[in-house]
Structures are given as C-alpha cells and as structure tokens.
Regions:
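Short, charged, surface-exposed secondary-structure boundary motifs
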Residues: 3-5, 49-50, 67-74, 109
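Conserved functional loop/turn residues at catalytic and ligand-binding sites
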Residues: 37, 73-74, 137
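Hydrophobic residues within well-ordered alpha-helices
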Residues: 33, 70-71, 113, 126
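Acidic, polar ligand-binding/catalytic clefts
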Residues: 1-32, 97, 103-105
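A bilobed periplasmic-binding-protein/Venus flytrap-type ligand-binding module shared by bacterial periplasmic
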Residues: 18-27, 108-129
C-alpha cells in the first residue's frame, strides 16, 4: 500500500522479533502464547504481533519496563526485536531467556527509508550514503549505540 505513494531506499537493516520468557518457562510455540499476558513496547512490531495471540497486551513506553515486569511476574512474555532481546538476556542473566521468533513463526522485516515517489536522484544519494556508512563501520556503531542499547 505504501509503495503506491512513496518509493523506498534499499533495505538497510533486517529485524527479527524474539520472545523473552522467564528462565524456567516452558513457552516454546505460537500456541503457547495464546491467552498469555504479553508485554511489548508501544507501537512496535511486537505490539502488532501480540494482538494476534491475545487481548492481554501490556504496552510500555520502554522495553526495559516490560522486561522488569516479566522478571516480577506481571507479564508472561515480552516480544521485542532481536538485538535488545539479547541485551536483556545478558542483563537479566539467569532470570530470562530469549527465544528466536522463527520458532514462533514470526517473519523478518526489512527497514528502509521512505522517499518521494519517482525521485531516483535522491534514492541513489540515500543508497550511496547508507552503503558508505556500512563500509566504514559507522552503521554497525549506530546499531550498537541506538538499537542494541537500552
């Protein structure tokens, strides 16, 4: 639908959703998510996915608050992007575990920049700039600072 009104840059990042559960949880499949209380960061992909499984969705402004509530038994699972999920698994070592979303049937999503329809010069410039950021390592540093960090 969006492709009808805008063009997109080349994808610059691929996101995968993960499920964070308590370390002793037996939740392992999509069916296990049904009727659970799922914590999500408001407005994220995890938020939209959770609504497919339950009406018990707890929305948070910050992902860390959702994980804290998981640790404290207020939610059953948290659905979140891979990188922050792995950071939380380390931060809350022994209390939570992060499970790949593919195990639950979650698909990957690509991030791209929306551009004015038909502006190939701008698309070429944006794609070139992203390629440069990736080539010199800046992109990886940005991911580490702004996506992996919480």
């Amino acid at each position: 639908e969006r492709k009808e009104s805008v063009d997109f840059s080349n994808p610059y990042y691929e996101a995968v959703q993960y499920v964070i559960v308590s370390a002793d949880s037996d939740i392992a499949t999509a069916d296990d998510l049904k009727d659970k209380t799922i914590g999500v960061q408001l407005g994220t992909t995890g938020d939209f996915i959770a609504e497919e499984y339950t009406s018990n969705v707890a929305q948070y402004n910050k992902a860390v608050d959702a994980v804290n509530d998981l640790v404290n038994g207020k939610v059953d699972v948290v659905i979140i992007d891979k990188n922050p999920a792995l950071v939380f698994e380390t931060k809350f070592e022994g209390k939570v575990k992060a499970i790949e979303g593919a195990q639950f049937g979650f698909e990957t999503e690509e991030y791209a920049i929306a551009l004015p329809k038909g502006d190939t010069a701008l698309a070429d410039a944006v794609n070139g700039a992203v390629d440069e950021l990736k080539a010199d390592g800046t992109f990886d540093e940005l991911v580490k600072t702004y996506i992996e960090a919480e």
